[in-house]
């Protein structure tokens, strides 16, 4: 897959494709699981399409594919923030990360420009997954998974 290819070329860690709805939750896993059941039990799968490839100076968003605006996902994000009691000034930017890295901008740009993505690119999100992100990427662990109805 593309993430594996870019990770190999950039000598950076590989990871599973995902859309991050919320991150860095401070509560216990038990509490988060209960809130996930409340929040996601009646949510239908979400169809998400993507617009273009971009890059940022953030490690976890080094090279990304931007998602087209999606009112259902936006509403789910707002609802999840309320369920999980998250107060933030950060703007929700739905995207699919393709590369985690601290590469120099020039090298990142070369990798980004080498990406050929068929159009249109879309995915259907069929589940919500809780991942403990303590430690390095190789220490991340999936702890809970709930299918969308």
Labelled PLM ranges:
Residues 1-48, 69-124, 136-149:
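Basic, often amphipathic N-terminal segments
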Residues 52-60, 97, 128-138:
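Short proline/glycine- and acidic-rich turn/helix-capping motifs at secondary-structure junctions
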């Amino acid at each position: 897959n593309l993430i594996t290819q870019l990770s190999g070329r950039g000598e950076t860690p590989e990871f599973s494709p995902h859309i991050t709805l919320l991150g860095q939750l401070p509560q216990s896993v038990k509490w988060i699981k209960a809130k996930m059941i409340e929040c996601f039990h009646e949510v239908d799968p979400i169809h998400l399409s993507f617009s273009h490839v971009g890059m940022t100076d953030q490690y976890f968003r080094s090279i990304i594919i931007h998602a087209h605006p999606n009112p259902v996902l936006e509403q789910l994000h707002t609802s999840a923030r309320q369920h999980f009691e998250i107060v933030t000034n950060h703007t929700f930017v739905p995207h699919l990360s393709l590369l985690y890295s601290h590469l120099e901008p020039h090298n990142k740009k070369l990798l980004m420009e080498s990406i050929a993505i068929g159009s249109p690119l879309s995915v259907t999100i069929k589940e919500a997954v809780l991942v403990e992100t303590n430690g390095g990427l190789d220490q991340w662990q999936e702890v809970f998974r709930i299918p969308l109805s």
